[in-house]
């Protein structure tokens, strides 16, 4: 079984030293969902929400969040991201929004947390913008879809998940 990398021999939390690692292209994709009533989703899709373009605001919030992950999650490294993409999809059949984020860099550590943070904050932004019309929206699940690059190798969620 793998060891927890952020715990030292004394059981204390610490930031991993990546100075000896090789720089490689690293990429991660994550997704999040926001479930809501059909009329709330319709308001977002039609652009009739009184606060403005919900998807555009959530996209920008997700991008900003990815760039600031190191300030939010204590043991994350500050990273020079080369790409952050946040896409939002209205799933009217299931009355939800699906958010997919992609983060990429050439560096010594992965971007999984940045991708997860981007998707999560985009979902939180949708909630914030729509809570005046619906307070019982549900956020989740949030998960890593794929990662590539680095010593630990590639990961991808099974297609049937």
UniProtKB/Swiss-Prot annotation:
It catalyses: (8S)-3',8-cyclo-7,8-dihydroguanosine 5'-triphosphate = cyclic pyranopterin phosphate + diphosphate. The gene is moaC. Pathway: Cofactor biosynthesis; molybdopterin biosynthesis. It holds the Pfam family MoaC. Catalyzes the conversion of (8S)-3',8-cyclo-7,8-dihydroguanosine 5'-triphosphate to cyclic pyranopterin monophosphate (cPMP). Belongs to the MoaC family. InterPro entries: MoaC (IPR023045), MoaC_bact/euk (IPR047594), MoaC_sf (IPR036522), MoCo_biosynth_MoaA/MoaC (IPR050105), Mopterin_CF_biosynth-C_dom (IPR002820). PANTHER family: MOLYBDOPTERIN COFACTOR SYNTHESIS PROTEIN A. Its EC number is 4.6.1.17. This is Cyclic pyranopterin monophosphate synthase. Keywords: Lyase, Molybdenum cofactor biosynthesis. The active site is at residue 128. One of its GO terms (molecular function) is cyclic pyranopterin monophosphate synthase activity. Gene3D superfamilies: Molybdopterin cofactor biosynthesis C (MoaC) domain. The keyword Lyase applies. One of its GO terms (biological process) is Mo-molybdopterin cofactor biosynthetic process.
